[in-house]
């Protein structure tokens, strides 16, 4: 269980301090993972620390950090470690963020080059305090990676840029290889799970990326186990396909602390497999659906499969 208070004894989630504690369900055997600590993990951690960078792997308490960092795979989280939203599922710190580090795009590019990454994932906190939501910072980071590690393919996992006109255009113009924006949950759960966001705005963002540049792969993911119904998940799949989203991820929600949204149930591996089968039938080029699936887990391998799936589809037309 991840603590709600950081090492300086400041509340990590001040908005959650007065919430009642919820029951934490015991994890089934299929959720358990090996603790990190290998030599590869230590090397990746050293490069991240040396460049003063943040990763969503650490900040969000991802269960796959040991596996990914051992392979020198890390998802860099730009624009600081403090988010202006307060989603009930998320372990990232909430509060008023610091000013942007204008050297961060260069630092990320250097770290990508040092790690020798063939594929990198860049995400960020929400920055509602910035006039463009951080769009230009994303674009500069993409440009830095292109310059310092030209052979690396780039996947971005963005916030929703709600009420930030022109932001999406700036990011798309930087031409990432994959544009990911997670819906996170079904629309009926937004009020309690993702109250600062709007389902149809997020859906429209994904659609707009395709309209602006059809060559960019689009991707979106959800968590299950939050109390959603199966039919709601199937409708969400239809919504994503209507927006021409190429790649869908589905993973089990894991509760960071007793103050966060509770896990209503653990979805079985067979149910995840069934979701995968239905999603492929609905036309997604790529689907990753398993208890430990996360947006950037196996992202490099999945990108290669995604590209191959598009080429195969075009070859049949």
Swiss-Prot record:
It is found in: Cytoplasm. The keyword Metal-binding applies. GO terms for molecular function: 4 iron, 4 sulfur cluster binding; lipoate synthase activity; metal ion binding. [4Fe-4S] cluster 2 binds at residues 83, 87, 90. GO terms for cellular component: cytoplasm. It catalyses: [[Fe-S] cluster scaffold protein carrying a second [4Fe-4S](2+) cluster] + N(6)-octanoyl-L-lysyl-[protein] + 2 oxidized [2Fe-2S]-[ferredoxin] + 2 S-adenosyl-L-methionine + 4 H(+) = [[Fe-S] cluster scaffold protein] + N(6)-[(R)-dihydrolipoyl]-L-lysyl-[protein] + 4 Fe(3+) + 2 hydrogen sulfide + 2 5'-deoxyadenosine + 2 L-methionine + 2 reduced [2Fe-2S]-[ferredoxin]. SUPFAM superfamilies: Radical SAM enzymes (SSF102114). Pathway: Protein modification; protein lipoylation via endogenous pathway; protein N(6)-(lipoyl)lysine from octanoyl-[acyl-carrier-protein]: step 2/2. Keywords: 4Fe-4S, Cytoplasm, Iron, Iron-sulfur, Metal-binding, S-adenosyl-L-methionine, Transferase. This is Lipoyl synthase. The keyword Cytoplasm applies. SMART domains: Elp3. Residues 12-22 have a biased composition (Basic and acidic residues). Binds 2 [4Fe-4S] clusters per subunit. One cluster is coordinated with 3 cysteines and an exchangeable S-adenosyl-L-methionine. Its cofactor is [4Fe-4S] cluster. It holds the Pfam family Radical_SAM. [4Fe-4S] cluster 1 binds at residues 57, 62, 68, 296. Its EC number is 2.8.1.8.
């Amino acid at each position: 269980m991840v603590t709600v208070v950081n090492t300086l004894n400041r509340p990590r989630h001040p908005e959650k301090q007065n919430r009642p504690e919820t029951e934490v369900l015991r994890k089934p055997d299929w959720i358990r993972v090996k603790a990190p600590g290998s030599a590869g993990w230590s090397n990746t951690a050293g490069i991240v620390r040396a460049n003063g960078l943040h990763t969503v792997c650490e900040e969000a308490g991802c269960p796959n950090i040991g596996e990914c960092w051992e392979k020198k795979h890390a998802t860099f989280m730009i624009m600081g470690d403090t988010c202006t939203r307060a989603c009930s599922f998320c372990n990232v710190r909430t509060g008023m963020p610091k000013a942007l580090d204008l050297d961060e795009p260069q630092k990320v590019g250097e770290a990508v080059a040092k790690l020798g990454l063939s594929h990198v994932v860049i995400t960020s906190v929400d920055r509602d305090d910035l006039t463009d939501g951080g769009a230009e910072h994303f674009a500069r980071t993409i440009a830095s990676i292109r310059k310092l590690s030209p052979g690396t393919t780039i996947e971005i996992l963005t916030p929703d840029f709600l009420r930030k006109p022109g932001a999406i255009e700036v990011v798309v113009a930087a031409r990432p290889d994959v544009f990911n924006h997670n819906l996170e949950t079904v629309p009926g759960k937004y009020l309690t799970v993702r109250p600062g966001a709007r389902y149809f705005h997020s859906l429209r963002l994904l659609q707009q990326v395709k309209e602006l540049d059809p060559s960019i792969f689009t991707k979106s993911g959800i968590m299950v186990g939050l109390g959603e119904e199966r039919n709601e998940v199937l409708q969400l799949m239809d919504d994503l396909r209507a927006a021409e989203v190429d790649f869908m991820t589905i993973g089990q929600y894991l509760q960071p602390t007793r103050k966060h949204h509770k896990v209503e149930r653990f979805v079985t591996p067979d149910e995840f497999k069934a979701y995968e089968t239905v999603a492929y039938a609905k036309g997604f080029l790529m689907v990753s659906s398993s208890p430990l699936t996360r947006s950037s887990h196996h992202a490099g391998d999945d990108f290669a499969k995604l590209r191959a799936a598009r080429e195969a589809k075009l070859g049949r037309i």
